[in-house]
Amino acid sequence: MQKDLEQNNVKGKKTASYSHVLMFTGIFGGVQSLKLVVSVVRNKLASYLLGTTGYGLLAVYSSITEFVTNCCNCGIPINTTQKASELYEDGTAEQMKDFACTVRTWVVWTAVAAMLLSVVLSPVLSYFFFEHQWDHCLEVILLTPMVIAFLVAEGECSLLKGMRKVRSVATIESIVAVTTLLSTVPFYYWLGLRGIILALIASTGISAFVHLWFSVRLVPYRIRPFSMRILREGWPFVRRGLPYVISGTAASAAGMAVPMVILSSGNMDDVGLYRAAFALMVGYAGMVFVALEA
């Protein structure tokens, strides 16, 4: 009798888990459809207002940002979701707050690492991406706020997913998709090529703010950057995340190498054309897998 009850409990948990996954996939499938439409409109306006040169610059800045982010995120967004889910189901509110403090503290240190890496790599990236010139270091360094915003958003999103706030995450994705369109196009229109970095900083900053707005209401924001206990508690997640960091860095390095190769024998217009074709053939189709990954 006891064995039958245990089997029924296991089956019930599996059924609930499958239902949760299906609900997650369905909701995010709808969100990805919205993001697809908004992305098409945004890319069309960007190509019209900035031309192929501006679109190429967008590709270069995005690849640099992605590379630095993957180098420094320590795999935290991937590894912390499961632990947050376990604490949400079986732990106490204080344990959840303590874990969120650990995640956010490590995110702060990854942001510091990203700032240092951006400064160190800025001369090299300027040389390879801007016709062997060294005077674009400041532009690369100015991408640092984007990286920090990405790291913050990823950390908060991992907590929300762990707490199974499916609708909150879907709402965030929808808001970010629309606000990205509304916040970038004015910069492109009024400032042209000079407004690209400002537009990217504004859009990623809004994304980080929206993620924080939803997550802080559930778990108050608290960090302890100099607490050895907090750092030790987060270290296992960093250690497990090392393979993800290596694979993500390798993939983003390959993505960054393509514009470098194009620029070695072409110009920024060619990079823009490549990026547009890549978005049509790969980027939009990949949104389906993003919905499944969620």
Task: Put a short name on every predicted segment.
Residues 2-6, 101-131, 182, 189, ...:
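Alpha-helical transmembrane segments of multi-pass membrane transport and lipid-handling proteins
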Residues 22-34, 140-146, 159-185, 197:
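Alpha-helical transmembrane segments of multi-pass membrane transporters/permeases
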Residues 137-141, 170-219, 240, 278:
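Hydrophobic alpha-helical transmembrane segments
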Residues 116, 120, 131-156, 170-171, ...:
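Alpha-helical transmembrane segments of multi-pass membrane proteins
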Residues 2-21, 200, 211-255:
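Interhelical loop/hinge segments that connect adjacent transmembrane helices in multipass membrane
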Residues 44, 56-73, 102-106, 205, ...:
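Alpha-helical transmembrane segments of polytopic membrane transporters and translocases
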